[in-house]
């Protein structure tokens, strides 16, 4: 059995789309929830009017996922972002079928997003840091490691989850370090609102470095140097638009700088093209 948990904050305008997909994907014994992350626009009331169980959660993506995990009584949980306008394939159904077909511990949904071809956090933070600090993890995620569409064994989500946008990083890395197997599934073409999430880049970078430090991949005394390495990358992400070719090149160059000492052997490596 699976719990389908649609997670969102102030998504009343689009919430029904994700819930419809979840109900279409669910079977006997499954549950469909809306995890309401401190919404103020009536999202929870809308979900209830559709017969959906609402799980209240504090503000923050990780806090919302933690609330879902805490309440979950099934072996697997399927997380869905609530701001779906459309997908060419039913996202939760595709994830469920991939889980059944592969027997993986986690399946992450990948998709084409024509309206958002520029994803700097993936290429400028996740890629260079994980490639060096957690090379065994990097190999499991080809296109969209930070996807909010995923299905996994609830036991995979061990330890306190990051409160915000680092939750996908946590699931990806700790799952791999625990010997869990991750597969990906193509959910087609996605359409949804493009929003600025100013805290996301810093939270993703911090989550990667926090795990690296806690598990001995990064020396505690070297952490400040790695935080300093991130600073120009974070600044450029905040300043760079999809059509700004000059700053995009500057961002690529910043992400390709040699990483500081204090990480695994070989960390002091130029990662051109990150």
Task: Name each model feature, range by range.
Residues 10-24:
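Short, well-formed alpha-helical segments that are part of the catalytic scaffolds
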Residues 163, 173-190:
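Catalytic donor-sugar/metal-binding loop of nucleotide-sugar-dependent glycosyltransferases
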Residues 185-203:
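Active-site donor/metal-binding and catalytic loop motifs
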Residues 201-274:
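Terminal low-complexity segments of carbohydrate-biosynthetic enzymes
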């Amino acid at each position: 059995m699976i719990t389908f948990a649609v997670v969102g904050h102030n998504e009343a305008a689009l919430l029904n789309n994700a819930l419809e997909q979840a109900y279409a994907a669910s079977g006997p014994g499954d549950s469909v929830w809306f995890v309401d992350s401190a919404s103020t626009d009536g999202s929870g009331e809308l979900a209830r009017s559709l017969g959906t169980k609402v799980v209240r959660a504090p503000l923050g993506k990780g806090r919302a996922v933690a609330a879902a995990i805490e309440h979950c009584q099934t072996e697997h949980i399927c997380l869905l972002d609530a701001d779906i306008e459309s997908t060419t394939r039913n996202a939760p159904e595709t994830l469920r079928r991939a889980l059944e077909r592969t027997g993986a511990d986690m399946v992450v949904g990948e998709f084409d997003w024509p309206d958002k071809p520029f994803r700097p956090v993936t290429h400028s933070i996740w890629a260079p840091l994980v490639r060096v600090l957690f090379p065994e993890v990097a190999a499991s995620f080809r296109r969209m490691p930070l996807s909010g569409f995923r299905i996994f064994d609830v036991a995979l989500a061990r330890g306190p989850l990051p409160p915000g946008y680092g939750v996908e990083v946590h699931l990806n890395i700790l799952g791999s370090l625990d010997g869990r197997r991750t597969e990906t599934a193509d959910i087609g073409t996605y359409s949804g609102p493009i929003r600025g999430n100013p805290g996301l880049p810093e939270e993703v970078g911090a989550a990667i470095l926090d795990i690296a430090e806690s598990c001995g991949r990064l020396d505690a005394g070297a952490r400040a140097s790695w935080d300093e390495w991130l600073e120009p990358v974070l600044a450029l992400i905040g300043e760079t638009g999809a059509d700004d070719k000059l700053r995009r090149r500057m961002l690529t160059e910043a992400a390709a700088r040699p990483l500081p000492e204090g990480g695994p052997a070989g960390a002091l490596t130029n990662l051109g093209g990150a």
